[in-house]
């Protein structure tokens, strides 16, 4: 009778518990069909099934009501129902109740332990999950099955590396018991090892599985892609196909991602064929990944055709193609596609707006960018960090820093990306005010306790390089260490550049040597620093180190090396580099052509320079300037003028550097009238004369003896004359022997550059040439008092591809004693011959 009364109450509960009349009636039919037989095991199981049917859409309150009824009926000690209650409470978010049910169970079977461990995992309580499992392991009456072992592995995986040793210890048990060959356990082990970054262990488990499910293949392939082993993921995919496993959309999508990363166009085409073969072309998400693969492999036309053929395009499809246009620098096409989105009634999301704003920035399309900005405000996308960052970048690149700052001030939160965008915008323009504003933004960033990233410091280093502030650069470098940031390629290159610009090549080399990973960008930065600071020998020695490394020199490397050879006037070295360029097929690069022209000109070989010019694949204004300067340096003014005429006849407009070469050619050749004409021609082209042009004109007039006219030209300069302009006049005075004007020119040069020894030396030599020894002595004494040191003359010689430098009275060479002995012997022989 007790059982009968209990099941009458169960029947009433079922009627209340079921909201759908059809489901309730069907349940009642089952219970009424053969009531006495349902009182036993069958009845309990059916009641459990009823609870599960309603678990998906029931509230926690109803779980408590049913639980209460179970207690009233005296069924709370039933292990089967308790297991179901734990599961139901877990799904409803009532882990407190699930835990109480579990703790009050007098007997727990394997399902009880598995359910509780799984419930803890479901709610992310991985530590408690491990505690429950370890309690089961300590008091186990039943042998573990694949479900509880899998739940344990999931818990260890959720601990982010802290459960590594537990899995290692469990591994031996799995091997002994044979569970390591279970596809379910094995798949979770593979997932754990991949998340732990241990791809080798994951591969061992994967290869040992006798049978692999689609989930197993998916886990292994996607894990390889996430860990940057895209090539391995492709190999696994081909192995999957050989095993006649039919890949699902997720596997194909993952492999396509690998093809995009590599990039591997042929692989993408093969996956495309599989998509068509298995009839998955209607899967929009898969087709979106295929479009992304094509655009990342540079096949934008194929991606566009695929896009046009999609019957069910969604916003992601449009955004993917839009991003592809941006990545391939097809910014006009991106703008047209963005416009088409509105015609089709689509509302661009934050990613589409971010992509199109980047295209606007690249094209300096301020008007279109402003319209997109208006749309983001209307669509309430302005608070998104991607959009805000792109807006700041767009306005900054369009030279509208005021608008960029407005966006920053309105939306800036504790987001390092936005601060980086604003600092980058100010640093890019390079004027004093903008550079100081970049530093102010950084100070505000630190005041708000926002942790800077490496990109922050790269932008700041660009600002300090423009300011040529060594102290600021060292402070920034120190802060990078303080924040514990490791130098990457960009930060290392920026540090090398800034120290080189501040004439601190030792610090540049320290940064270079400390870089654990050096790519060619780092090497080229160091080469450029040495060449810019005339440390050409160091550049050549470093090139020998590069040849011993894994990196291979590119056109920028050889451009620096050819320039270094030219600065050393070593035609032999220059020709060796030229031969290497021919072997590598780099001689057609415009950077290389210009460097070769300059090198041959400095080495006194204008004929070879002209040959390099004639063999150039394309001649830009820099190339023409180089050959004109080559003729100028060798006093062939007429040829330089002829090249200028030929240049203009080919439709290439000269720039201010062109006229520096032309005026220099006229000066060296004594072509005064031609020089004056070219100076006027420069003004017709709208080129304002700069210091270099005035130096050439003063030199031209000074060599012709027109010193007063040269002085008048200097006094008419719109800006304060630099020291080099006065030194040019001083040189003319030395040739003409005009002491009075020389004194004036020297004083003006010294006022402009007090530490330059050239002006003192030239004035002293003028006095000496006139026999004014007292005045010459006073100049030398003044140099000592003012701490002006004349840079000693140097000479160099290349022996066995090694450059040896010698200074006046220098004994630092390792074989100095032998060298001076030979020199003394030569002097004795010379005197004997004379």
UniProtKB/Swiss-Prot annotation:
InterPro entries, sorted: E_motif, Eplus_motif, Pentatricopeptide_rpt, PPR_At4g14850-like_plant, TPR-like_helical_dom_sf
PPR repeats: 78-112, 113-144, 145-181, 182-212, 213-247, 248-282, 283-313, 314-348, 349-383, 384-414, 415-452, 453-487, 488-518, 519-553, 554-588, 589-619, 620-654, 655-689, 690-720
Domain of life: Eukaryota
A Pfam family hit: E_motif
Type E motif: annotated segments: 725-800
One biological process term in Gene Ontology: RNA modification
Keyword terms: Repeat
GO MF annotations in UniProt: RNA binding
Cysteines engaged in disulfide bonds, as pairs: none
Region (Type E(+) motif): 801-831
The UniProt record lists the keyword Cell cycle: no
UniProt-listed SUPFAM superfamilies: TPR-like
Family: Belongs to the PPR family. PCMP-E subfamily.
Name of the featured protein: Pentatricopeptide repeat-containing protein At4g39530
Source organism of this protein record: Arabidopsis thaliana (Mouse-ear cress)
Phylogenetic classification of the source organism: Eukaryota, Viridiplantae, Streptophyta, Embryophyta, Tracheophyta
């Amino acid at each position: 009778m007790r059982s009968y009364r209990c099941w009458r109450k169960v029947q009433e509960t079922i009627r209340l518990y079921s909201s759908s009349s059809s489901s309730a009636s069907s349940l009642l039919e089952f219970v009424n069909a053969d009531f006495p037989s349902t009182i036993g095991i069958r009845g309990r199981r059916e009641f459990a099934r009823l609870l599960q049917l309603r678990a998906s859409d029931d509230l926690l309150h109803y779980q408590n009501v049913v639980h209460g009824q179970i207690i009233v009926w005296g069924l709370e000690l039933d292990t089967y129902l308790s297991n179901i209650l734990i599961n139901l409470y877990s799904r409803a978010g009532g882990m407190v109740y699930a835990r109480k049910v579990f703790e009050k169970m007098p007997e727990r079977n394997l399902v009880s332990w598995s359910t509780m461990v799984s419930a803890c995992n479901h709610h992310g309580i991985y530590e408690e999950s491990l505690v429950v499992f370890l309690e089961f392991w300590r008091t186990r009456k039943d042998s573990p099955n694949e479900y509880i072992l899998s739940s344990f592995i999931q818990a260890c995986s959720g601990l982010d590396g802290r459960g590594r040793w537990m899995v290692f210890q469990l591994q031996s048990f799995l091997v002994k018991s044979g569970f390591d060959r279970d596809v379910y356990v094995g798949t979770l082990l593979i997932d754990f090892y991949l998340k732990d970054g241990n791809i080798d262990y994951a591969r061992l488990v994967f290869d040992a599985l006798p049978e692999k499910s689609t989930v197993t293949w998916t886990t292994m392939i996607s894990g390889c892609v996430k860990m940057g082993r895209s090539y391995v993921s492709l190999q696994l995919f081909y192995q999957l196909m050989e095993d006649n496993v039919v890949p699902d959309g997720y596997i194909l999508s993952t492999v396509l991602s690998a093809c995009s990363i590599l990039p591997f166009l042929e692989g993408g085409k093969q996956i495309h064929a599989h998509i068509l073969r298995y009839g998955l072309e209607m899967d929009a998400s898969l087709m979106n990944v295929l479009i992304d693969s094509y655009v990342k492999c540079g096949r934008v036309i194929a991606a566009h055709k695929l896009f046009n053929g999609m019957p069910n395009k969604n916003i992601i499809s449009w955004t993917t193609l839009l991003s592809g246009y941006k990545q391939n620098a097809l910014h006009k096409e991106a703008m047209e596609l963005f416009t088409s989105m509105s015609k089709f009634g689509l509302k661009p999301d934050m990613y589409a707006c971010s992509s199109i704003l980047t295209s606007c920035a690249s094209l300096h399309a301020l008007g279109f960018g402003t319209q997109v900005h208006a749309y983001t405000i209307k669509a309430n996308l302005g608070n998104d960090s991607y959009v805000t960052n792109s807006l700041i970048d767009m306005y900054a690149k369009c030279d509208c820093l005021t608008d960029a700052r407005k966006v920053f001030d309105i939306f800036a939160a504790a987001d390092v990306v936005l601060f980086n965008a604003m600092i980058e915008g100010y640093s890019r323009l390079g004027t004093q005010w903008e550079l100081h504003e970049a530093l102010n933004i950084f100070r505000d960033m630190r005041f708000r306790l926002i942790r800077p990233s490496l990109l922050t410091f790269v932008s700041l280093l660009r600002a300090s390089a423009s300011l040529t502030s060594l102290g600021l650069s060292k402070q920034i470098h120190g802060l990078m260490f303080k924040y514990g940031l490791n130098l990457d390629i960009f930060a290392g290159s920026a540090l090398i550049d800034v120290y080189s610009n501040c004439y601190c090549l030792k610090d540049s080399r320290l940064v270079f040597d400390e870089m654990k990973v050096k790519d060619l960008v780092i090497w080229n930065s160091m080469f450029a620093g040495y060449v810019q600071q005339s440390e050409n020998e160091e550049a050549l020695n470093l090139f020998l180190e590069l040849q011993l490394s894994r990196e291979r020199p590119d056109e920028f490397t050889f451009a620096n090396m050819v320039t270094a050879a030219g600065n050393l006037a070593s035609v032999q070295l220059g020709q060796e580099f030229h031969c290497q360029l021919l072997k590598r097929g780099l001689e057609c690069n415009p950077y290389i052509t210009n460097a070769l022209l300059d090198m041959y000109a400095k080495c006194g070989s204008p004929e070879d320079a002209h040959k390099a010019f004639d063999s150039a694949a394309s001649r830009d204004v820099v190339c023409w300037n180089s050959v004109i300067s080559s003729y100028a340096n060798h006093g062939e003014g007429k040829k330089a003028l002829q090249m200028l005429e030929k240049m203009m006849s080919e439709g290439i407009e000269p720039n201010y550097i062109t006229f520096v070469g032309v005026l220099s050619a006229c000066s060296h050749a004594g072509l005064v009238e031609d020089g004056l004409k070219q100076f006027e021609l420069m003004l017709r082209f709208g080129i304002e004369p700069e210091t270099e042009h005035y130096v050439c004109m003063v030199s031209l007039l000074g060599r012709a003896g027109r010193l007063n006219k040269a002085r008048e030209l200097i006094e008419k300069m719109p800006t304060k004359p630099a020291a080099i302009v006065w030194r040019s006049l001083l040189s003319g005075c030395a040739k003409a022997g005009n002491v009075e004007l020389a004194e004036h020119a020297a004083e003006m040069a010294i006022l402009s550059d007090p530490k330059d020894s050239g002006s003192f030396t030239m004035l002293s030599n003028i006095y000496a040439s006139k026999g004014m020894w007292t005045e010459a002595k006073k100049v030398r004494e003044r140099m000592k008092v003012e701490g002006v040191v004349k840079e000693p003359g140097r000479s160099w010689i290349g022996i066995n591809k090694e450059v040896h430098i010698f200074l006046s009275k220098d004994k630092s060479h390792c074989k100095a004693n032998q060298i001076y002995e030979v020199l003394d012997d030569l002097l004795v022989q010379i005197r004997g011959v004379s």
